[in-house]
């Protein structure tokens, strides 16, 4: 019984640890960073719709290269002054109140296999970006 309680406590701890809280002032330059493996970012704002943006090499023309878009490729509204840099960082310049939301990346790999065949799993990191008053 005590082992189950410890397991539940650990799972709750891992779930909380996977969410990072970041405040930003309207008008500031804001940088979100989930690591170098990130090309595509996903966000969910108050409207509960998933929106995507990604880093693109020169010559790529898909809608996600130009700014946040909905799953069907339509520009997200209200718009953001945001882009993804080659190193995977999401930059807002400037940050607007409508940019507040939950940010993550579908590029993060929660399950990894090492050379010996062992499997490890971690929860994807989510950044809750809020407006600092």
Predicted regions and their residues:
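Extracellular/luminal ectodomains of metazoan preproproteins built from arrays
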Residues: 19, 27, 132-133
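Ligand-binding face of N-terminal immunoglobulin V-set domains in extracellular IgSF glycoproteins
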Residues: 77-118
